[in-house]
């Protein structure tokens, strides 16, 4: 090869330097001067023989060669012609060719030549006059489209101030009444107890009613102006004759910009005070989108640089075999794709976790408020202690060692009285211990003094066992039950299910 290999960046720099396409674009301060024209590099499946690549590299730059003129035959002639030829109807595009070396492999890159903007200055000068006529036509058409807004008002609320825009009438700044009490939320209603200001009025003929608005005798270019910014065009109307400004002594004025927005209804986007008593309002409207002159700029054309592998005749067989292998691997991978959608690492609908025999989801039970299920875990009746077996405890997911520890604690607190250890399930599950009271104590509870004694006993029990959600269960921590909230029963200290018994603690699981 006679030309030195270049990297991808060199191709892009060369393509940009050889093109004057940016000259067609109007200047915008937000544009990237090095971003136009735009290129992308593509590596299609295919190759070109070394002898044929040499012929492209040795020819004159910026030419449009025909592969049929090359006498040497290649095995994949159709593929090469499809890549090198331009896809346009009957016309051959101009290309330059460069050799690229990437990861030890040589490529022949075809760079499209973008037409230079300075090649036909006469045509550009002629188009300037046509452009002026087009701008005048677009201005007239824009005013015609906006005329549909006559008799309608738009509103905009910004903090204390609200604004009304009534086309062909005026723009007003006022304070709105708070909504409620018969005052609608929209449109905002003016509070006549505060000052309001007219920011600008549309020009009207003499003697015409100000509230109805009318067309002025001025030309369309005096009423409106078509401006271009960033490739998009919008209509501008400058309104004067507003209320007098206290600071400057001049009348207020406002500039209104109408922008095409096909996804929006007529609305005020924002309004700001550029300087004292001079304002700028931007309005989005789909009406202007009916004229192509106001449509948003289209996406810039991206030119494709195609790079194909350069092979010797001896390397063609190996390349074809590798290409066929890659195609077969793609077919295998597509066949192995999961039939069900995978979300969060779980194949939805595969029934790997539930849905088959032995993997059923237990139906939930809707428990109403106050509905509880009580099962006896252990109890002491007439001095005899009865406990559930280890297998039965496992059904309730209870630890045998913990139950034994709670049993000893109940024995200590009961002081020889009968007691019951229950597991209560409902909206959650917890253990509850109940100590039976003596008959004499039951009789004592009926009088006033007994109520006082029982209340004191209940308070002492709370100090010992603690309340739910409160830290510091000293006895509970010593017995290995730290972290399980404790509380008392109802205020009278009686269990509705067990007559003559007193609840000692409640241990949530």
Swiss-Prot record:
Function: Lectin involved in the quality control of the secretory pathway. As a member of the endoplasmic reticulum-associated degradation lumenal (ERAD-L) surveillance system, targets misfolded endoplasmic reticulum lumenal glycoproteins for degradation.
Subunit field text: Interacts with missfolded ER lumenal proteins.
Signal peptide: 1-23
Disulfide bond residue pairs: 153-166, 245-277, 260-289
Principal location: endoplasmic reticulum
Gene Ontology cellular-component terms listed: endoplasmic reticulum lumen; endoplasmic reticulum membrane
Glycosylation sites: 120
Family stated for the protein in its record: Belongs to the OS-9 family.
GO biological process assignments: endoplasmic reticulum unfolded protein response; retrograde protein transport, ER to cytosol
UniProt region (Disordered), positions on chain: 64-91, 433-509
Domain MRH: 151-291
Bias-annotated ranges (Polar residues): 64-74
Protein name (Swiss-Prot/TrEMBL): Protein OS-9 homolog
Membrane topology: Peripheral membrane protein
Natural source organism: Emericella nidulans (strain FGSC A4 / ATCC 38163 / CBS 112.46 / NRRL 194 / M139) (Aspergillus nidulans)
Biased composition (Acidic residues): 436-451, 489-502
A Gene Ontology molecular function term of the record: carbohydrate binding
InterPro entries referenced in this protein's UniProt entry, alphabetically: Man6P_isomerase_rcpt-bd_dom_sf, MRH_dom, OS-9-like, OS9-like_dom
UniProt short sequence motif Prevents secretion from ER, positions renumbered to this chain: 506-509
């Amino acid at each position: 090869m006679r030309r030195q290999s270049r990297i991808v960046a060199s191709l892009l720099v060369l393509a940009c330097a050889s093109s004057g396409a940016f000259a067609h674009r109007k200047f915008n301060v937000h544009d990237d001067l090095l971003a136009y024209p735009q290129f992308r590099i593509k590596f299609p499946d295919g190759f070109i023989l070394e002898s044929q690549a040499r012929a492209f590299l040795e020819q004159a730059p910026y030419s449009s060669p025909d592969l049929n003129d090359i006498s040497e035959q290649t095995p994949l002639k159709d593929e090469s012609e499809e890549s090198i030829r331009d896809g346009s109807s009957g016309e051959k595009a101009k290309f330059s060719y460069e050799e690229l070396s990437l990861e030890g492999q040589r490529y022949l890159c075809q760079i499209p030549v973008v037409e230079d903007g300075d090649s036909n200055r006469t045509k550009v000068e002629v188009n300037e006059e046509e452009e002026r006529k087009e701008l005048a036509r677009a201005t007239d058409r824009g005013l015609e489209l906006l005329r549909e807004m006559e008799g309608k008002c738009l509103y905009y609320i910004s903090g204390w101030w609200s604004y009304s825009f009534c086309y062909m009438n005026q723009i007003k700044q006022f304070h709105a009444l708070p909504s409620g009490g018969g005052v609608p939320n929209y449109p905002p209603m003016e509070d006549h107890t505060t000052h309001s200001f007219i920011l600008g009025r549309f020009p009207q003929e003499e003697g015409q009613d100000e509230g109805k608005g009318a067309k002025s005798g001025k030309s369309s270019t005096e009423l409106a102006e078509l401006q271009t910014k960033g490739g998009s065009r919008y209509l501008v109307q400058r309104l004067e004759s507003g209320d007098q400004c206290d600071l400057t002594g001049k009348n207020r004025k406002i500039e209104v910009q109408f922008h095409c927005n096909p996804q929006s209804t007529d609305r005020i986007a924002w309004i700001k005070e550029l300087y004292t008593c001079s304002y700028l309002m931007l309005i989005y409207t789909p009406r202007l989108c009916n004229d192509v002159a106001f449509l948003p700029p289209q996406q810039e054309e991206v030119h494709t640089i195609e790079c194909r592998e350069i092979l010797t005749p001896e390397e063609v067989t190996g390349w074809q075999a590798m290409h066929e292998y890659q195609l077969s691997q793609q077919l295998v991978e597509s066949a192995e794709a999961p039939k069900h959608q995978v979300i969060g690492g779980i194949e939805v609908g595969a029934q790997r976790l539930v849905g088959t025999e032995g993997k059923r989801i237990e139906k939930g039970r809707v428990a109403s408020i106050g509905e509880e299920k009580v099962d006896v875990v252990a109890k002491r009746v007439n001095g005899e202690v009865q406990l559930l077996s280890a297998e039965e405890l496992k059904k309730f997911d209870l630890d045998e060692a913990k139950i034994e520890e709670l049993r000893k604690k109940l024995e200590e607190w009961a002081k020889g009285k009968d007691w019951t250890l229950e597991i209560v399930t409902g909206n959650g599950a917890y253990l509850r211990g109940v100590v039976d009271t003596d008959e004499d104590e039951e009789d004592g509870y009926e009088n006033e003094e007994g109520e006082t004694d029982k209340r004191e006993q209940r308070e002492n029990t709370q100090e010992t066992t603690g309340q739910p959600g409160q830290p510091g269960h000293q006895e509970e921590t010593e017995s290995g039950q730290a972290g399980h909230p404790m509380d008392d029963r109802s205020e009278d200290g009686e269990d509705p299910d067990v007559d003559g018994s007193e609840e000692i603690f409640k241990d949530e699981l």
